[in-house]
Design a protein with these regions (language model features):
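C-terminal alpha-helical interaction appendages
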Residues: 1-56
Length: 56
């Protein structure tokens, strides 16, 4: 995975958690962020990327 994309995902998850969002809302926020910076990615691919980052 592109290290820059991984950093974007980690930051989105951190920001969502700091805002008091639950696990699902954190994930949704990260997927939205990925789709904003990588509009070529489908929602499914963005979700897969978020899940991969969470597992690391």
């Amino acid at each position: 995975m592109d290290p820059d994309l991984e950093n974007v995902i980690r930051q989105a998850l951190t920001d969502a958690k700091a805002a008091g969002k639950d696990y699902l809302s954190q994930t949704k926020e990260a997927v939205r962020t990925v789709r904003q910076v990588r509009p070529d990615m489908t929602a499914s691919a963005a979700l897969t990327a978020v899940n991969l980052v969470r597992r690391r």
